[in-house]
């Protein structure tokens, strides 16, 4: 078995005066989709932000592709570029007349490396290939401000694809999509995981989707309550620990 893409070891992160995440340890293997589930306020977004180096950690270790995150949350540039992040909300000024192909092209440019072919044929090919992989090539000349929610999510996946990646992190990225668009989004994720060997770490409130689509699940409520396959982890006992017994009764009644 190959080495895990992400290793989190005894991680504790504080929000002001309280431990929002306490003594959490897990790994994210290559080619697998790992979901983080738990109630509001459980520390899911805090955990993601610590992994990304946005929030400082009180204690513990984080390794990406074998490289340790520094105490200041930094990784070597060549490792940092192996991580793609899709937030729940993508905010931009809709008055900016940027097209889909221009936005995806920024994913190629954003390191600021001046290569001989930057802006040339290799860049155009990478943008076209990324849009093709997410079935969005037909949108390339469309303004980003004119995209539907489902179209925008596909374009943002293309932005992540335009350079090689090893780890994709999503903070409820499908939130706000209709059922059809959400299903298409997860179909694309499954395809990319299979074809690219991506390790995926995502926050989700949709337990049915987690059961259908994810390989592993982490049940979080400040501490890690359980981890494993969805069938082994999303039991009534574990869900009651994470969410409370009222949630479990309601969820099973639906």
Please provide the spans of the model-predicted regions.
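Conserved ABC transporter NBD signature motif
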Residues: 60-72, 77-79
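H-loop/switch region of ABC-family ATPase nucleotide-binding domains
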Residues: 204-205
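Catalytic Walker B motif of ABC-type/P-loop ATPase nucleotide-binding domains
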Residues: 168-172
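Conserved ABC ATPase signature
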Residues: 143-147, 151
